[in-house]
Amino acid sequence: MQLSLRLSAIAGLVTRGNRLVDVGCDHGYLPVSLYLDGKIPGAIAMDVRKGPLSRAQEHISQYGLDAYIETRLSDGLEALKPGEGDTLVIAGMGGPLMERILTDGAEVRESFREMILQPQSDIPHFRRFVRKIGWQITEEEMVLEDGKFYPMNIGRAHV
């Protein structure tokens, strides 16, 4: 499966062997690609909208991965329990929305080993928020795709 440059960069930041949670999964390409590459043992792909989640489920089924990648209709982290994943990916959303997701899902957020975050707006404020909640940005990437820069951060708690 060929990922966009942005999604390839995100995939490269995921720690091998971690169970992935992809919030705002859209088409589900990221967890499918990571599983097919043998980088993750499984994933939970979540989206707030039925249409994108349905497309994700179609792609998951197309590759025969229903036993490894689960889909959930969810507003942020609300359909997730603590400990269900190791790596959280939230990408392609505005910083304020990502902040709301991480604030509303604080209990679940604290159960992750790492968060890969790719805010589309309000980046300086979002970086301060990540530090404020006790996470440290330990790695950063920047990708230029279709004339737009996409910053990506890896956050780890208690570093």
What are these regions (language model features)?
Residues 157-159:
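Conserved small/polar residues in nucleotide/adenosyl-binding loops
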Residues 104-153:
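C-terminal substrate-binding/active-site "lid" region of AdoMet-derived donor-dependent transferases
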Residues 49-51:
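Conserved SAM/SAH-binding beta-strand->alpha-helix loop
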Residues 54-83:
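S-adenosyl-L-methionine
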Residues 17-26:
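Conserved class I S-adenosyl-L-methionine
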Residues 2-17:
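Conserved alpha-helix/loop element of class I SAM-dependent methyltransferases that forms part
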Residues 28, 32:
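Glycine-rich SAM-binding Motif I of class I
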Residues 42-47:
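Conserved SAM-binding motif I beta-strand of class I
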